[in-house]
């Protein structure tokens, strides 16, 4: 009887302790706003979510020992509505570009609070990623041809900032020399198709997606502004101060997503396509070796300057009277801690400016590829990895040997002058006296090079014909 009574008392005590622990167990929300279709945000959102990487790093010791996590994801097509929900307290983290990020900081300050930029995810110190496109049948060949024309752009986006800088560089007045109208990318596609606008400026990936889909042609790349741009992640500063370990956990997940993408860009480009509908070749254009942008999680001086420039642009446009201080708006403490916890050297990465390297041999000759401004790639359908070639000529010869029945996802070339990665069917080519082809983004660039080498400028169809004829003559 005494034994039974003792057992009941022990059980009751255990239940009381358990009930007390349960009552005091904290549930912490981790609410992350993503931009899935803005594919250079993938390592800060889509891949973390789809690969369940955050669960690996969320803290579960110390003050987090009994914590339950309520992880929430919400996808957006632009930064402005994401910012609205962050300011409303519905989200803790958000991924967006420099310009909307500056607006995020201003919106928080207006509400008497603060947000901070905690990492870069993907960017270009030259400005690649943003671009201007025209309808595919347009006679426009460059920005100078757009004077007096209507150009649409998503207002308050990083592309908007790029467009204003490009117009200023032409010596034009944005209020009188061009007609700038606001237009979301999902509307711009049909407008370009129907020739309802003369040109459209947009951010990642639309300046390359629309040409890939055959409804537009790129006539200006953001790199021509030489103004750094990036997409990164922000966090509510109060949340970060309360849960710094969770912020570091999120960034460690981003670091792993970045590593996985570098190891197998084909695999994860296909995953991005599956989730977003953005075709895998467009994803690979950014995330593959020598891609349009550099996946870089460090706060290089150029990216800090991009934040400062965005804030100055907001003031110039009179978009805000509560702009954040660039010196404190960027906070690198969390990403430094995440690098350290991941066994990585932040300061070494900070000094590294190279794109994801291409270490490959020519698929035909087997020789190592050395000249990366003229490299070309062919991505066939199926599970086969991308094939690499030392030049467009070599790639086109290989395509000719595959025959018309070959299912080709995409062919990539690089602008000879800048090294910018391009879809081969969107490039201009110079054929020299020896039949060697050199690729360029702009016809003006091809024309100038053709004069240097006494060559002829041809389009993609003609370039393939040239190599086919050369192959037949062998």
PLM features: what roles do these ranges have?
Residues 48, 129-139, 229-245, 430-431:
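A bilobed periplasmic-binding-protein/Venus flytrap-type ligand-binding module shared by bacterial periplasmic
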Residues 361-366:
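Short cysteine-rich clusters marking metal-coordination/redox-active sites
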Residues 67, 150, 154-165, 170, ...:
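Ligand-binding clefts/hinges and TM-proximal coupling segments of bilobed small-molecule sensing domains
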Residues 26-173, 179-182, 198, 227:
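Short, glycine-/small- and polar/acidic-enriched structural segments
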Residues 21-25:
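Sec/Tat signal peptide C-region and signal peptidase I cleavage site
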Residues 175, 181, 186-275, 393, ...:
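Pocket-lining segment of extracytoplasmic ligand-binding domains
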Residues 314-359:
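Conserved C-terminal helix/tail region of periplasmic/extracytoplasmic solute-binding proteins
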């Amino acid at each position: 009887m005494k034994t039974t009574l003792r057992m009941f008392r022990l059980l009751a005590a255990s239940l009381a302790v358990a009930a007390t622990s349960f009552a005091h167990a904290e549930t912490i929300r981790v609410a992350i706003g993503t931009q899935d279709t803005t594919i250079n945000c993938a390592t800060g959102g889509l891949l973390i979510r789809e690969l369940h990487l955050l669960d690996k790093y969320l803290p579960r010791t110390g003050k987090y020992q009994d914590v339950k996590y309520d992880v929430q994801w919400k996808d957006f097509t632009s930064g402005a509505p994401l910012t609205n929900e962050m300011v409303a307290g519905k989200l803790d983290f958000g991924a967006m570009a420099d310009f909307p990020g500056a607006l995020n900081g201003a919106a928080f300050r207006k509400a008497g609070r603060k947000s901070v930029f905690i990492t870069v995810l993907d960017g270009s110190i030259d400005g690649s990623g943003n671009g201007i496109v025209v309808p595919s049948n347009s006679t426009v060949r460059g920005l100078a041809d757009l004077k007096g024309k209507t150009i649409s752009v998503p207002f308050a986006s990083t592309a908007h900032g790029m467009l204003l800088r490009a117009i200023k560089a032409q010596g034009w007045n944005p209020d009188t020399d061009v007609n700038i109208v606001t237009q979301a990318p999902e509307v711009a596609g049909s407008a370009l198709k129907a020739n309802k606008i003369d040109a459209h400026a947009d951010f990642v990936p639309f300046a390359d997606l629309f040409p890939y889909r055959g409804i537009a042609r790129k006539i200006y790349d953001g790199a021509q502004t030489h103004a750094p741009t990036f997409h990164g992640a922000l966090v509510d500063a109060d949340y970060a101060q309360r849960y710094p370990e969770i912020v570091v956990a999120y960034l460690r997940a981003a670091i792993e997503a970045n590593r996985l993408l570098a190891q197998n860009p084909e695999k994860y480009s296909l995953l991005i396509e599956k989730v977003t509908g953005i075709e895998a070749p467009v994803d690979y254009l950014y995330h593959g070796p020598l891609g349009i942008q550099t996946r870089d999680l460090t706060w290089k001086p150029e990216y800090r300057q991009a934040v400062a420039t965005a804030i100055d642009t907001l003031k110039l446009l009179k978009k805000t009277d509560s702009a954040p201080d660039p010196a404190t708006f960027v906070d690198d403490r969390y990403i430094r801690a995440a690098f350290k916890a991941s066994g990585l050297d932040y300061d070494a990465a900070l000094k590294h400016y190279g794109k994801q390297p291409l270490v490959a041999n020519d698929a035909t000759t087997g020789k190592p590829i050395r000249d990366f401004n003229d490299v070309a790639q062919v991505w066939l359908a199926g599970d086969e990895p991308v094939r690499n070639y030392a030049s467009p000529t070599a790639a086109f010869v290989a395509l000719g040997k595959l025959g018309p029945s070959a299912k080709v996802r995409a062919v990539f070339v690089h602008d000879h002058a800048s090294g910018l990665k391009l879809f081969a069917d969107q490039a201009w080519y110079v054929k020299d006296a020896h039949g060697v082809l050199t690729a360029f983004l702009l016809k003006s660039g091809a024309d100038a090079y053709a004069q240097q080498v006494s060559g002829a400028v041809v389009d993609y169809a003609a370039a393939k014909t040239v190599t086919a004829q050369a192959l037949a003559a062998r």
